[in-house]
Amino acid sequence: MYKHFWQKGRTFYYVSKYGRVYSTTDADSHPATWHLIATYNGKGYRRVRLQGRTFKVHRLVAEAFVPNPDQLPYVLHKDGDRENNRWDNLEWSDRQSNHGGRLNINK
């Protein structure tokens, strides 16, 4: 499953629930023809740059596929692996849980 999340002129951007971000110039094209556009930042997170703004892939996946009924501000990787951006490995969190996860206190 893919969700459209951005459009710049005639370029369309999609995120998959498996953590892949694609661009295409044809909204009706088959996903096999799309281009993977994510890179890594210095901290191990995958990111994309669109119109001068940088977006973390795990956040795009969570916003598209992980419900956030409590409007929590942070996205955690359940298994601690920053490269595992699958929707089922992500959860919304508050600041305290996010900090605790980095220190491995909450495991």
Where are these regions (language model features)?
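Conserved recognition-core residues within compact binding domains
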Residues: M1-Y74, D79-K107
